A protein has these predicted regions:
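Non-catalytic substrate-recognition and accessory regions of acyl/acetyltransferase enzymes
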Residues: 1-103, 111-131, 135-175
């Protein structure tokens, strides 16, 4: 079972060796933790579920992190903008990918995302939906989120102007 810590500037040395992998989107997630997540953790209000968390295993090793904020999407009604909790970034260090062995519900990645879902439910004023974007060629992540009942949100995908990568919009309705 993972423990979590709200990310603060003093935790920056803990994340310097964080490594999600070699794919461009994996490097992007690791770099986000080392730069923008720290900035966001200090500048975003902690109200309404905003924040960044570090997740540690029983050996106190940094396993992963997650950042949640709010976003405005024209969904489900394309004529109306609505604010939703948004998983800005979720990362698991490559050393802990697929760990621990056993059922997927016990894996670190699963624990992190279900913890984010629980965070969202603490703030009913922002709704009971969690949104995110996933790289279009990251089939493993897409399957993972589909197993957690995330669905594709048509018309909200975006193309990163710097990398020309396409990211698919996904959302899950929480109980």
């Amino acid at each position: 079972v993972l423990s979590k810590l709200r990310f603060r500037w003093e935790h920056l040395p803990l994340v310097q060796d964080f490594d999600c992998g070699d794919e461009p989107w994996e490097r992007e997630i690791a770099n986000y933790l080392k730069s923008e997540a720290a900035d966001g953790a200090l500048t975003q209000s902690e109200e309404r579920g905003n924040g960044a968390w570090l997740y540690f295993n029983e050996d106190r090793a940094l396993v992963g992190y997650a950042v949640i904020g709010l976003t405005n999407w024209r969904w489900p009604d394309p004529k109306t903008k609505k604010q939703y909790p948004h998983a800005v970034a979720i990362g698991v260090d490559r050393r802990f990918s697929g760990q621990p062995p056993g059922p997927r519900e016990g894996r670190y990645s699963w624990q992190i995302v279900t913890d984010l879902m629980a965070e969202v439910l603490k703030y009913p004023d922002v709704g009971s939906v969690l949104t995110l974007f996933v790289h279009e060629s990251n089939a493993r992540a897409i399957a993972f989120y589909r197993n957690l009942q995330f669905e594709f949100v048509p018309g909200l995908n975006y193309v990163d102007r710097t990398t020309a990568s396409t990211y698919l919009a996904m959302a899950v309705k929480l109980p």
